[in-house]
């Protein structure tokens, strides 16, 4: 709950009429305390007060209310005192929490720095984050709309509170609607000769799409960065998309996108180590499923794929919650890396309930009878494939689609299985 408190240090009502202080006077100083997020200068700028202007208690009440309504502060108190020169104002604030990041989805006409600078001249409390409560998010939307009008942009600025459904707000996402913003081409700086053709090939599908910073950032993480991780550049990074307007009409804005690549060192694999409890399976069995090759560039994407195969292996013994962490220990002096695979097998899961869907009652009964993994037995994640192979004669794959869904229940340490049969048309 936000609190706004006032303290009047000059009790004018107690003074004789001939010595009573004026209700309005010149503002000669402002002192701000209590915030670790903002500087006094930023908070003073947010008040809108100017030294030398004539002020009174009503002005200070308005300032306190304004600061409180932004959501940036959980408490706002003020006091003031008179002297022969004018009024001294003291503001005591307490920072509110939480704050979350702000994302600008498609403001392609200004760089991030230019946009931030323009915002800060109008919204001194903006620092790249906003409080989840209060009206500062609305104020920022109005500021962005004003900036858009200054640049003769006729779209409407809106924002979304991003986050999981029924979960906390994780970010504010601002965008401008109107004429489409289309990607013409994508380029990369900093990429090596071996990686550049691969990047260019992946980027071709982006050309012609609407510009979306969040989608491009996802592309960078999911499609561009793995190209470097596959080739041993374990510390590579892909910078944010940098749009440049190349053509603009009333109906469309076209942009070129540049990504700045920082590959870093290329690491070659020196050795593989297994740690944790590796007694469930012989070490040589585990190593058979790890395809990294000593002396070759360390393929981090392959390491993640190998982990999935190792998890499947552990699942055949009921370890459905096994944790396997591949950790690269890099050595920059000789550009080598030791990959350490740490195993935490967790608990053994048992077979739970079996559900069969999509068949008539008799066929359902036959499938339940044919399923040999009984409730309470140690679960085998490989059994479903064995089962599907055993019924392939009754349900040929070219005529039937059979989906297997495994649902581990962590509390009871069981796995419920659902088999869905759909006839292909």
Regions found by a protein language model. Name each.
Residues 1-4, 155:
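Positively charged n-region of N-terminal signal peptides that target proteins for export
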Residues 19-425:
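Interaction-mediating elements
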Residues 8-17:
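Hydrophobic h-region of N-terminal signal peptides that target proteins for export
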